[in-house]
Amino acid sequence: MSVNVLVVDDSKLARINAGKALCALQPDWQRLEAGSAAEAVDVMEREQVDVALIDFNMAERDGLSLAADLRERHPTMPIAIITANIQDEIIARAREINASFVAKPLTAEGLQGFLAGAALRLRTGG
C-alpha cells in the first residue's frame, strides 16, 4: 500500500528535515510538501493524502486551524502538529482535534512514535 504524507511547513529547511526523518523511518512512504496552509489545501484537492505533518507556527494561518479543517474532511487521518512552541494550550488544542503533538527540532526519534501509530491506524482502517 502506498502511503502519501503531506509535510506542511513554511520553512523549506524544516520540510527537508521532516523528509529525511520520514525516509529513515518509512522509506516506502511518499512525501508531498506544502509551504503554507493554502498550498496544503491545494495539494489535498489534487492528491490522495493519508498522513499529515503540520507546523504550528505559519504566517497566514496556524497549523491547528489547518489541522481542524483536515480533521473535518478526514476524520480518521493521522495528523501531527509539529512545533517548538511547547505550551499546554497548544497541546490541549491539538488533543481536541485528535491530533498528535511532536516537538521541534524534528528528529527521527521524535517522529517514530507518531509514524508507528499512523501505520497501525492505516492498516486497521482507522
Please place each PLM-identified region on the residue numbering.
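Active-site residues of response regulator receiver
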Residues: D55, T83
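Acidic catalytic/metal-coordinating carboxylates
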Residues: S36, D62-L66
